[in-house]
Amino acid sequence: MRNKLAAMANTLAQDDTVASDEIAAAIDYMEIKIRTAEARNEPVPFVAFRTRTILTIALKLRQESDLSL
């Protein structure tokens, strides 16, 4: 599973149709979804957790390679 997540994050990091600020906004949205579930004592939505992970890795890859998309 980890290799698939890394591959998806790498693809997103190199996608010039998605801006870095859009990725950051999506990370913030996923954080809200996760925190809301935690505050309600509900299970954390797996899709939100997985998506946040992919987005976070993609943004870090961009920052580390100085891609300013």
Cite the ranges covered by each PLM segment.
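N-terminal acidic leader/helix
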Residues: 1-31, 60-69
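Short, charge-rich amphipathic interface segments used for partner binding and complex assembly
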Residues: 25-64
